Amino acid sequence: MSKRLRVEDDFNPVYPYGYARNQNIPFLTPPFVSSDGFQNFPPGVLSLKLADPIAIVNGNVSLKVGGGLTLQDGTGKLTVNADPPLQLTNNKLGIALDAPFDVIDNKLTLLAGHGLSIITKETSTLPGLRNTLVVLTGKGIGTESTDNGGTVCVRVGEGGGLSFNNDGDLVAFNKKEDKRTLWTTPDTSPNCKIDQDKDSKLTLVLTKCGSQILANVSLIVVDGKYKIINNNTQPALKGFTIKLLFDENGVLMESSNLGKSYWNFRNENSIMSTAYEKAIGFMPNLVAYPKPTAGSKKYARDIVYGNIYLGGKPDQPVTIKTTFNQETGCEYSITFDFSWAKTYVNVEFETTSFTFSYIAQE
């Protein structure tokens, strides 16, 4: 004989099998549905849990697609938009390479040919060059930095006679930058002090010829007591001295009789606008013409004698004595002693040119 289970009239036979009085109990997910991927939202509705890039579009599960991705019509495949040099090969995104690029050890690199190299920590310790592409240079070629970046340049040795002209051509002689000639310019403007400032024009040209210096000198006195020689009224005036003193770099010193601003490398018929910083190659050789020391022997070769003529007249001679490295307070020196034995009356001191040579320091 069977029995019937007695239940209350308000029992709800639909899961969760509650009673009418339990209406505040939230709707529960049926026990046969996993909570992984499902949710009870809104209450009483079984729905999917969605996380980006999954979305519901027009009631369908869809995929949010950003830039660079596309869903193909018809096939529904998700593909990558590849613009050159990117490309799809065998369902893989890659990069199209052309010389000089390559992939080595799974890394994009640059193929460097002859004369080029990629500097690494194994090849150089200079931090400024590491991981950069550089030009390998040999003798005579170098690099330098400019406002527009690095440049490859030809290395021109100082004092070698080579330079670049205004067109950028390498020349052995540049009339606008003649560093084979130190001079005072050929004009007659005063540049020297004998007795008073700018009382004379000393014309001196030093031209480097290998190990020798070819020199030419002349003098015009334009003011002061030596302008007109009159030994009847000034019998004691029988000579004077002009000294050129140079420092260890061959730069003319302020204590010289010749004005420093009038002495420089040649630029056509003038001098270069920028003062020179080094001219040792024009200096008298310290071995051939040693500086005087206690007990040292003085040789006749240290002196160059010659005759110049006042007003260009052969009967008005003046002796010019040139000595080298005999002055103190300097590294190098050239000294000109002008003297005359003849009695001159109202003769203007304007000399002919005198040419001589001496052994160069370099």
Curated annotation (Swiss-Prot):
Top-level taxonomic group: Viruses
Any Gene Ontology CC annotation: viral capsid
Keyword annotations: Capsid protein, Host nucleus, Host-virus interaction, Late protein, Viral attachment to host adhesion receptor, Viral attachment to host cell, Virion, Virus entry into host cell
Alphabetical GO biological process terms: adhesion receptor-mediated virion attachment to host cell; cell adhesion; symbiont entry into host cell
Subcellular location: Virion; Host nucleus
Induction: Expressed in the late phase of the viral replicative cycle.
Recorded family membership: Belongs to the adenoviridae fiber family.
Quaternary structure and partners: Homotrimer. Interacts with host receptor CXCAR. Interacts (via N-terminal tail region) with pentons.
Note: All late proteins expressed from the major late promoter are produced by alternative splicing and alternative polyadenylation of the same gene giving rise to non-overlapping ORFs. A leader sequence is present in the N-terminus of all these mRNAs and is recognized by the viral shutoff protein to provide expression although conventional translation via ribosome scanning from the cap has been shut off in the host cell.
UniProt function note: Forms spikes that protrude from each vertex of the icosahedral capsid. Interacts with host receptor CXCAR to provide virion initial attachment to target cell. Fiber proteins are shed during virus entry, when virus is still at the cell surface.
Protein name, per record: Fiber protein
Organism the protein comes from: Human adenovirus D serotype 9
